[in-house]
């Protein structure tokens, strides 16, 4: 439980962090026109201009002035995000915020603060997962900056992240993390496919769709794992802690083997490395579920809208 003093400190840090991200921005076109700007950065910024226009005119998203100005960051992430779950539960801890309501993560603009808070939660017995967010969204309250951390991935990944964040800006259901993230994930994926199709990039479209099929296969594995682990905790809740801990450890070892088998099936040496080579716990399992588990539902809704973005958004807002 946060004390009043620590809450004030957190919000003070949040205000300062927000100002650091939103001041000192440069219009994208000005960066492009600068002869000192590297070729790759110019390409990415020109792509963002194209994607913003597509998002507004074809996807019916609220673009406004979001991501129209560039900000370079000398760090790998915009925000460090802490997720926590009890030692024997797959349900994430929630925190309350003034604008978005309850949210199942806590973000920090300083990595050191995120690590300190993670250590505090671990000391209280929680499983903790510390992730990095490369994008930043104020849900339409401000004109969000295009951060350099945005631009490390492929064109398709950049498009997906941009469409995801603009989806949040367009519609956000207060207090329902899984709804918002799964909806934004599903809509962004459909948006990328429409964009590639309009450009006539059929080979890239097929490659992207192959990636989505792999993600969907992993989503099924993740959903099954979360369900099974939840049942283990429920059915053994009265067992000694040592017994619970052993079963938990055995479960995650088995889960890693399943991920390794998927990697072999896909013939991709780097696939799922965050699940195979790094620690996996309740918090990481549950955090990933937020973004994936309801995606099939929102994908099905896309079919009900006959693939029309405007109709789709109207259907989502009625849910």
Describe the residue ranges of each PLM region.
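A well-structured
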Residues: 41-42, 51, 62-81, 93, ...
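Pan-zinc metallopeptidase signature
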Residues: 220-319
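Bacterial Sec signal peptide processing site at the extreme N-terminus
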Residues: 4-26
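Sec-exported extracytoplasmic/periplasmic mature domains
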Residues: 33-37, 50-60, 167-171, 188-200, ...
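Acidic/His-rich structured neighborhood in mature extracellular/periplasmic domains
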Residues: 50-215
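Extracytoplasmic/secreted envelope proteins and their assembly/folding machinery
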Residues: 42-45, 49, 114-118, 159-164, ...
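A ubiquitous short alpha-helical element
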Residues: 10-15, 210-217, 279-286
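Amphipathic alpha-helical packing elements
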Residues: 18-55
């Amino acid at each position: 439980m946060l004390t009043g003093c620590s809450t004030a400190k957190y919000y003070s840090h949040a205000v300062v962090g927000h100002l650091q991200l939103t001041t000192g921005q440069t219009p994208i076109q000005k960066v492009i026109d600068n002869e000192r700007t590297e070729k790759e950065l110019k390409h990415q910024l020109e792509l963002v201009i194209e994607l913003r226009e597509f998002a507004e005119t074809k996807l019916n998203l609220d673009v406004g002035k979001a991501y129209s100005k560039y900000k370079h960051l000398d760090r790998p992430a915009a925000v460090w995000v802490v997720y926590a779950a009890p030692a024997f539960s797959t349900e994430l801890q929630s925190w309350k915020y003034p604008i978005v309501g309850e949210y199942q993560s806590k973000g920090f603009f300083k990595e050191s603060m995120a690590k300190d808070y993670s250590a505090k939660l671990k000391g209280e017995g929680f499983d903790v997962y510390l992730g990095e967010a490369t994008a930043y969204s104020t849900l339409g309250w401000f004109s969000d900056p295009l951060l350099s951390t945005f631009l490390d991935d492929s064109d398709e990944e950049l498009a997906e992240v941009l469409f995801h964040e603009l989806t949040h800006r367009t519609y956000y259901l207060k207090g329902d993390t899984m709804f918002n993230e799964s909806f934004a994930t599903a809509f962004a994926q459909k948006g990328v496919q429409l964009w590639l199709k309009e450009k006539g990039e059929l080979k890239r479209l097929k490659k992207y769709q192959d990636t989505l099929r792999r993600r969907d296969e992993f989503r099924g594995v993740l959903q099954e794992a979360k369900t099974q682990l939840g049942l283990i905790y429920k059915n053994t809740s009265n067992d000694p802690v040592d017994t619970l801990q052993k079963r938990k450890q055995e479960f995650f070892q088995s889960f890693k083997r399943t991920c390794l088998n998927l990697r072999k099936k896909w013939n991709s040496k780097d696939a799922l490395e965050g699940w195979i080579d790094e620690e996996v716990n309740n918090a990481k399992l549950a955090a990933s579920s937020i973004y994936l588990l309801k995606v099939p539902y929102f994908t099905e809704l896309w079919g009900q809208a006959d693939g029309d973005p405007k109709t789709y958004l109207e259907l989502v807002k009625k849910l």
